[in-house]
């Protein structure tokens, strides 16, 4: 008997996540890879720390242990991709791939063409405490309404959209992520979850730049 490839000893404690084999037969831990689209409500915290109130893991309460690829801050809402496929998470988080993430944003005062231009071309944002001093990468910004706009980012700086707006004298009052790469939030209700499957899942793996573990994911 082995646990995660190591010979087991009498009285050894194991968790549900560990792989247990008797000879060559796996009796626990051969989990099917799962990839989920989650509509995170505002107020839920993206953290794996179970001590934190209203954390996303406890909120989701999914039977398989999953984590997120690309967090949303507590006040933001919308699409999270959550999975137990570590290789997919790592690939999605690699900055060099410039993966697209799209948001709908509401601000506290009327949007101007100058605001749209500056947001599109790049904004200088700073935060001494976070050791942040950067000019944001050019991005696609479109005005939707008097106080709302859409923005497509290919980078993930800390609270980037909020900081960009603040630098231009605006305050974000609502921020919803509606798309990550090819996966769209669509009509998924707040707090709801759906599995990403079939061609949508295949395309996600392709865009993430990995095919590792897809045999398990597509069974």
Where do the language-model regions lie?
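Basic, flexible Lys/Arg- and Gly-enriched helix-loop patches that mediate nucleic-acid binding at interfaces
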Residues: 1-219
């Amino acid at each position: 008997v082995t646990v995660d490839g190591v010979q087991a000893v009498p009285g050894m404690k194991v968790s549900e996540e560990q792989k247990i084999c008797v000879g060559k037969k796996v009796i626990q831990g051969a989990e099917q890879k799962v990839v989920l689209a989650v509509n995170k409500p505002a107020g839920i915290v993206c953290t794996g720390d179970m001590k934190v109130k209203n954390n996303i893991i406890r909120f989701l309460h999914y039977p398989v242990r999953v984590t997120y690829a690309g967090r949303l801050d507590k006040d933001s809402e919308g699409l999270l991709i959550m999975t137990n496929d570590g290789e997919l998470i790592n690939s999605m988080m690699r900055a060099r791939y410039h993966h697209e993430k799209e948001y709908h944003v509401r601000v506290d005062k009327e949007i101007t063409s100058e605001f749209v231009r500056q947001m599109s071309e790049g904004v200088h944002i700073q935060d001494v405490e976070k050791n942040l001093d950067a000019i944001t990468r050019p991005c696609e910004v479109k005005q939707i309404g008097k106080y709302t706009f859409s923005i497509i980012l290919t980078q993930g700086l800390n609270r980037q959209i909020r900081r960009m707006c603040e630098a231009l004298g605006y305050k974000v009052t609502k921020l919803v992520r509606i798309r990550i790469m090819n996966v769209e939030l669509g009509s998924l209700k707040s707090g709801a979850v759906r599995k990403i499957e079939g061609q949508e899942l295949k395309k996600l793996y392709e865009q993430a730049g990995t095919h590792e573990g897809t045999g398990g994911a597509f069974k």
